[in-house]
Amino acid sequence: MNTSRSIVEVGVAMVLKDRFSQEAGKISGSFRTMMNDMNTWNRGIQMSASNTMDFGMQLVGGMARAYKYSAGVQNEVWTASKIAGATIAEQREMLQLAKDVNEITPLTASDVASGQRYLAMAGNKFDAIKEMIGPASKLASIFTMPVGQKGGVADLMTNIMSMYQIPMTEAARVTDDLYTAVTNANISLTDLAQSISYAGADMATAGVDLRQTAAAIGVLGDMGIQGSMAGTSLANMIRYLQLSLVNQKKKGYNALADLGLSPDEFFDAQGNLIDLYTIYQKFAKAAVDLPSRIETPTFFNIFGVRGNRGMLPVLRDIASGRDKMGKILATYDQNIGAVNRLNEERLKTDAGVIDQFESSIENLTVT
């Protein structure tokens, strides 16, 4: 209060002196400058205090978010380890694995940990999870999909491998095969997995492997027959074919004879069905120049309505010379190691370098 009064008194004195001095204008200007400087200084103190408070709140908030994120990652790993029956040492290794995978992919440690949980939920133990999470995460990064959560790559991949009883040690090869099938046809990984969920049981029972099944799904996908529709078509096709071959479907058995096909040529020496691509080729050859008046009832009697959708589109594709199934089958071996190679190439790009930097910062919060 005294300070404010002394300032006012000085101001009044200056104004009074202005009336009797030739320097009156300068003095009034000096006073205004002094007051402006003092106001600026006062606002600066207030802003500094406010900024300090804001910074402190942001710092505390950031620490809270980091702690919450770290706790979330550790909880995912803890849950996965309990489901998988892992030891304490294996649980720690799973946490470190989530951080390691985070550093070589654009995925978050939280997403990777979620992927581990879904692998565990599918019945995989620690060793299998360790084999699968890296390849699954790399495939997820290529397809810009999550590796965790329901419908993520880990979930889809373990379902497919379980359907065909593929050892988890072959996870890297499976990701290469899935990458090849998806990138050579008009389907997504989700489409492919859904088709396999409908067709896989019948295909696997008939001895048709993942590569051939995925290649056939790719051909149908190019023609708009995708997802469950493709899977249902292929399941009916292979099922009715086998029934026709052993004369349990009498009209189908007779239709095979009308095409000049013998049931014996569809089985190997051990009595197992020959490979799917060769089956398609045999029917494609038999159907050449066959008039629709004969083709329609003949193939209906063998494969039924839905089964025809899994046979005729592929035959037309082969007859056209496009032969997408043959091309996909030939590409599988060429693409061995493709997922790992593409992931390494991406890490060398500007986006990859940024991702690695962000991952390193993220890993600091996961302790």
Task: Show where each model-derived region lies.
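Disorder-to-helix initiation segments
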Residues: M1-F31, V73, D350
